[in-house]
């Protein structure tokens, strides 16, 4: 069992206070000061050797917060975070924020793509909203909005430039048909109960507020009045990363390829065997190299986003009998989504919100030069190939543009300027995040599967995971319903408002 220096502070503090006090009293009263001095020096040396021996036995022994971090992982760590996207760096920041003294926790973030060329975070449209159907998602968004508004208080670094998150508080606008109006009203009631500033509008009110909208087929609209809009995803990722590094977090560029685990088999009350395991070492493969490094650790956090299911399999999750808890996989898959930047000089102006059409198409303003970001999630039978980052331009021409032009007639004359593809860490079970410890691998935690809203919830989820680890439970927002156990108990936590 790993013995933490946090639990035994007397090893580094109490012993030394006693020695110093005894030494001061001895030197002040004894007539044999020289002999006592020699004895004290020898005793000091023995204590130094003892302290070094104790510290060498801990995973944090070879690290100093003042030592510059490099790309190679250390031999030991307290916490290894798999995934250096915004979720991983948020968790790292909050862990260091909660440590009781600098250097108490040695945290390592492992990211296989240091350029972030395939990262979900920086390829996102950058939206934040409170218009969800689950109270937990609404509460996380409310916290994240306040966090972003005060980001320099949280993530500012001395002698570094202030953070400009480029937050555009223009709101989200959801449109519903007759079939979806009842659900929209139900969601609205939940949102208001949670404190979200949202209003409902009938078609004539909608047309008065936004004259450029064609209201045909719209029965009801839901509009966010505060704390909704969009921001720059890369700035948030880099701000979390910069702050965490300044607090002593170690970053490593490489890919986690294996876990070494200790296993123990037990028999349940029903007489069924069950295997519990604990990760002892993480194997990190260096980029463009055959070299790998084994990292001894106490905890592992799976924040690998779209690829987190593969990381879970390395720990044996989902590899047992299909009718057992050991056989339940982490139901998170990569889903490729296209984002198109279009230009339309006569399109909606400064009042343009992030509009979610009842057809599933969406768009928002990008700057003030007549540019917009647009897209749509494909139907299940049209899911694109995830093996590459190529963009399907026919999908825009056939599936997106007609819907945009129907809702905003000015978009009939738009032109595509550029486009890109990104990945959702899509939870196929209920489209909600997975947060907390695995029930059988008792030092593996999850923070993944948010199905497109992980970026906006990263400040809240990072804080929640840090609370679980440092405090032993959720202290601010109760996210226990997001646990892995719901897959075994067959209790889906459905989110209706997935874009």
From Swiss-Prot:
Top EC category: oxidoreductase
Top-level taxon of origin: Eukaryota
Keyword Transport applies: yes
MF (Gene Ontology): oxidoreductase activity
Example GO BP: mitochondrial respiratory chain complex I assembly
Key words of the record: Electron transport, FAD, Flavoprotein, Membrane, Mitochondrion, Mitochondrion inner membrane, Oxidoreductase, Respiratory chain, Transmembrane, Transmembrane helix, Transport
Transmembrane parts of this sequence: 75-95
Highest classification ranks of the organism: Eukaryota, Metazoa, Chordata, Craniata, Vertebrata
The protein's required cofactors: FAD
The protein, known as: FAD-dependent oxidoreductase domain-containing protein 1
Record organism: Xenopus laevis
Signal peptide range in chain numbering: none
Principal subcellular localization: mitochondrion
Protein EC: 1.-.-.-
Membrane topology according to the record: Single-pass membrane protein
Protein function: Required for the assembly of the mitochondrial membrane respiratory chain NADH dehydrogenase (Complex I). Involved in mid-late stages of complex I assembly.
PANTHER family with a match to the protein in the record: FAD-DEPENDENT OXIDOREDUCTASE DOMAIN-CONTAINING PROTEIN 1, SARCOSINE DEHYDROGENASE-RELATED
Gene Ontology CC, one term: mitochondrial inner membrane
Pfam families to which the protein is assigned, alphabetical: DAO
Subcellular location: Mitochondrion inner membrane
């Amino acid at each position: 069992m790993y013995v933490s220096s946090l639990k035994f502070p007397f090893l580094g503090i109490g012993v030394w206070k006693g020695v110093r006090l005894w030494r001061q009293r001895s030197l002040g009263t004894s007539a044999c000061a020289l002999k006592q001095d020699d004895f004290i020096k020898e005793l000091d040396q023995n204590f130094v050797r003892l302290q070094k021996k104790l510290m060498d036995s801990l995973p944090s022994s070879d690290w100093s917060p003042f030592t510059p971090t490099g790309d190679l992982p250390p031999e030991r760590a307290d916490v290894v975070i798999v995934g250096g996207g915004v979720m991983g760096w948020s968790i790292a920041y909050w862990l260091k924020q909660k440590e009781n003294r600098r250097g108490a926790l040695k945290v390592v973030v492992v990211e296989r793509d240091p350029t972030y060329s395939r990262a979900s975070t920086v390829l996102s449209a950058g939206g934040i909203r409170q218009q969800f159907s689950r109270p937990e998602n609404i509460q996380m968004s409310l916290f994240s909005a306040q966090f972003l508004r005060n980001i320099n208080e949280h993530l500012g670094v001395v002698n570094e430039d202030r953070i400009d998150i480029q937050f555009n508080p223009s709101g989200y606008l959801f449109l519903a048909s007759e079939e979806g109006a009842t659900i929209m009203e139900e969601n609205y009631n939940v949102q208001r109960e949670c404190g979200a500033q949202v209003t409902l509008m009938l078609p004539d009110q909608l047309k008065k507020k936004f004259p450029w909208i064609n209201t045909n087929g719209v029965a009801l609209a839901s509009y966010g009045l505060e704390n909704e809009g969009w921001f720059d995803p890369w700035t948030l990722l880099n701000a979390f990363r910069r702050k965490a590094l300044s607090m002593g977090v170690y970053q490593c560029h490489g890919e986690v390829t294996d876990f070494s685990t200790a296993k123990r088999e037990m028999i349940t009350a029903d007489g069924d065997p069950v295997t519990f395991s604990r990760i002892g070492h993480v194997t990190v493969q260096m980029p463009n190299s055959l070299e790998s490094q084994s990292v001894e650790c106490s905890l592992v956090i799976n924040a690998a986003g779209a690829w987190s299911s593969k990381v879970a399999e390395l720990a044996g999750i989902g590899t047992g009998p299909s009718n057992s808890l050991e056989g339940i996989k982490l139901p998170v898959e990569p889903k490729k989504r296209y984002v198109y930047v279009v230009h339309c000089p006569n399109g909606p102006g400064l009042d343009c919100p992030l509009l979610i059409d009842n057809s599933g198409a969406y768009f928002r303003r990008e700057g003030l030069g007549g540019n917009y970001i647009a897209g749509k999630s494909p139907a299940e039978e049209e899911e694109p190939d995830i093996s590459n980052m190529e963009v399907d331009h026919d999908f825009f021409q056939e599936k997106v543009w007609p819907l945009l032009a129907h809702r905003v007639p000015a978009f009939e004359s738009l032109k595509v300027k550029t486009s890109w593809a990104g990945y959702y860490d899509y939870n196929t079970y209920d489209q909600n995040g997975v947060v907390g410890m695995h029930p059988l691998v008792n030092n593996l935690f999850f923070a993944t599967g948010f199905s497109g809203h992980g970026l906006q919830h990263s400040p809240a989820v990072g804080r929640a995971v840090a609370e679980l680890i440092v405090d032993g439970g959720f202290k601010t927002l109760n996210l226990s319903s997001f646990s892995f156990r719901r897959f075994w108990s067959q209790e889906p936590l459905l989110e209706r408002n997935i874009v």
